[in-house]
Amino acid sequence: MGKTAIALNICLNVAKTYEKTVAFFSLEMSREQLVMRLLSTESFVENQKLTTGHLDEEDWGKLSIASSALSQTDIRVDDNPAITVAEINAKCRRLDNLGLVLIDYLQLMTAAAPGKSGDNRVTVVSDISRALKIMAKELNVPVICLSQLSRANESRTDKRPMLSDLRESGAIEQDADSVMFLYRDEYYNPNTQDKNIAECIVAKNRHGETGTVKLQWRPQFFTFSDLEWKHEG
């Protein structure tokens, strides 16, 4: 659906626009895979070209400019697949000018003390969710945590996700200040007229309004943008 892609888009925006340090903890993808995606997003060179190495002179020029721009940002990527909240907290406390923490994704995280909550994943995920909430308050920075959904929406006519679809949700809905879902109609309906259109559904917003924003999705660059936005170059 594009949850890692939109997380990287947010990561880039915070690092470039606000010149803040961003900590990205990836439990699913490797550092190398994420860097390739960042390069594709920043350079507008198709990711397939990067992975196959089939690059022309124009591509190399774009990559050079993108690499220079990325080198001016402070994006820290940690791809430890077994990291705990306590370890994330400790790493973040050592970072200066921290502006955002991103975690991809919640259900892959392990409890600090394995076996403490038994084999009940709902309880484990709820404990992790609560610990992340406390960490965000202590660090005084926003923490964006990606999450899997259950497959309950697949049995509905309208497959747009709802809060009740949060997998192993427990306290996720309660702890989060904001909950946003991504929905792309073509994922379920290949013949839809909304090709490469994504809906960002703000299902919960403790400090503002809820609603839906439509975005343009460019899968070849792993990029989301405003519908009216056009890349020059």
Show where each model-derived region lies:
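Hydrophobic alpha-helical membrane-association signature
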Residues: 7, 124-131
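Conserved lysine of the Walker
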Residues: 3-4
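Cytosolic-facing regulatory segments adjacent to core modules
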Residues: 7-9, 13-97, 111, 212-216
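Flexible beta-alpha connector loops of hexameric P-loop NTPases
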Residues: 47-57, 75-81, 110-126, 153-164
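C-terminal regions of RecA-like/P-loop NTPase motor modules
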Residues: 85-101, 110, 115-117, 130-140, ...
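Walker B catalytic acidic pair
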Residues: 105
